[in-house]
Each structure stands twice: as C-alpha cells, then as structure tokens.
Amino acid sequence: MWPAPCSVGRLLIFFMCSSSGYVVQGCGPSPGARTTLGSPLSLWSIKTPSHIFCTRRAINLGFPSPPLVQLIFWSLNAGLDLYLCLISSCGFSQVFWPVEAFCSFSLSFFALALSHKFVICRLDQHIFSGFTKSLKNLPPCHRTDI
C-alpha cells in the first residue's frame, strides 16, 4: 500500500486541477506537512483556486530570456521537485522509470502553466520577470499559503 499522500487519486486530482477544493499537501511523512526541496533559490508558491503546491525550484536564469524559455526551465524544475518529493516519501523510483516520471511531471506543469490555471505569487522581495505580462507585478504570498 502506498502512503496516503501518494495515492493515485490525489495525484490525479492534482494534475487535473479539479474544482473540488482539495489542497495538495506536502509530501512529508506527516499529514499536512509541506516540504522544501531544492537549492536556496527564490521561493515561490504555485497556487490554483483549489490547490496549493509550494516549491523552491522556481528558476531565475539571472539574465533576460524569452518568456517561453523561462517557462520551460520553470516546468523542468517543478517536475524535478515533485519527482524527488515522491521518491523521498513514497518510493516511487520502484514504480516509474526516473526519466519517464520526470518528463511526465514536467510536461504536466508546462501544460497547466500554459492553460493559465496557476496563480504565482512571490515569497521574497525580488520580482521575477514572469512568463506573461500578468506576472510582472506579482502579489506577495500570505504565510498561510506555505
């Protein structure tokens, strides 16, 4: 049996962005715990109206780049975070081939971001040059979001 945070139903709910009001909790061993993975880059909270998923791997390339390039890098990093999270708490490495899972997660984040289902808010004082014009002046996150 997989632990509760790793159930297929919850993953499907997350990826399908349902309107059920479900909040995606972190992948830690304790219920409701949130994890912080990745290098100490800019902290971001990635939210939809019914889901909250926080990651530390929002990428800032440090130089001007086309929005699509930034979105691709962000998607890859978000996919890597989720993959590492599942491995650490669920042992998913025994279920998925690493490359296949990483690519699947990254493509999912990329598709969701393109569909504008995510609202991104900043947790630090730096305004990340966002992927679209609507993200150039990001509202600060509430601490309850993380």
From Swiss-Prot:
One of its GO terms (cellular component) is membrane. GO terms for molecular function: protein homodimerization activity. The keyword Membrane applies. Residues 88-94 are cytoplasmic. It comes from the Eukaryota. Residues 27-66, 116-146 are extracellular. GO terms for biological process: protein folding. Its main location: membrane. Expressed in brain with higher detection in neurons than astrocytes. Decreased expression in Alzheimer brains. Detected at protein level in brain and cervix. The chain crosses the membrane at residues 67-87, 95-115. The keyword Ion transport does not apply. Homodimer. Interacts with DNAJB4. Promotes neuronal cells survival to stress conditions. This is Stress-responsive DNAJB4-interacting membrane protein 1. It comes from Homo sapiens. The lineage of its organism: Eukaryota, Metazoa, Chordata, Craniata, Vertebrata. The gene is SDIM1.
